[in-house]
Amino acid sequence: MADKNFQMSTGVAAVVQKVVEACQDESKRLDLIEVAKNYPPNQLRNMQRTFQAITGTFLDAFLKKHLSKDFETLVLMLYKPRAQLLCELIRGATKGAGTDEKCLVDVLLTIEAHEVREIRQLYYQLYNDSLGDVVRKDCGNKYMWAKLVNAVATGDRIPRETHELEEDLVLVRKAIETKGVKKDEVSTWIRIFATYTRADFRQLHRMYAVKYNGESLRAGVEDEFQGLDEYAFKLAHDFLYDPCCAAAFSMNVAFAGSGNDSDRLNRITAMHFRECKGCKYYYKKVYGQAFDERCTTELKGVYGEAIKLLWEPVTVPLLSMEDCQGGEHRPMTLEL
């Protein structure tokens, strides 16, 4: 039946065989990571269909049978279509009695504008529910991180005119200079982080540094918030400026404390290892330690090797803010 209903190339069949062997032989576990890293998502989906046709088993079920713990969770995430993964993470964070605030922050504050629109549609198709309504109901509107997440989940990013940037420059300065957390100032940050395009935010960043003797917007965020609020607003800032910055920041937070946060390590890695090519560069530049060294210290066995392998070892950042591909600004890594 499989031969009749599924035409498969020798290449895809070979990948399926590689996945099977990697699951069954512990010494070949990292082959699962190599496949996820080297094959684009559309080819991975084709491989999964071929896997089921050959073995008669869903890939997820096969992986769960042979893998365990953090490595299993990571691999399962890597082999899911991105939009499906994001929806499942959000669903898992909001269902049940409690809310996984950290997961909602990590997911909703580090996806691009076009993805937010796509996720809204897919979420409704999968769960017959509105993403915005679910997030709003689960997070409430009491905490500042929740207000920010709600704004991102329901808003749209709109290009600004020069005069609008100049007006916001004044409001941002006022927010930074205001002692204590005030409603109007928080609203300014939320509006900017939830509705600015990346190009406009980078321009605002440059304008602020020029006008205020090299001061950084991020420093203002650091002084403004605490706890999860601080993490959320820093993450939103970094992602809007450059996804590589956000990935490095979040991974460093996951490493901090008495034990590392493997849930966050898995989320951020699975979501961003493909496009954030400058993460390791930025990590070393900001945190003073090579990313691979930190992984070796904090993580054990094949799981640690997998995390290191997925993030590419880039030593030189992309150089130009004006360097574009297909009309989209390419992520870059600069000093904040």
Range-by-range predicted roles:
Residues 1-336:
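Structural signature for extended repeat/solenoid scaffolds and their inter-repeat hinge/linker regions
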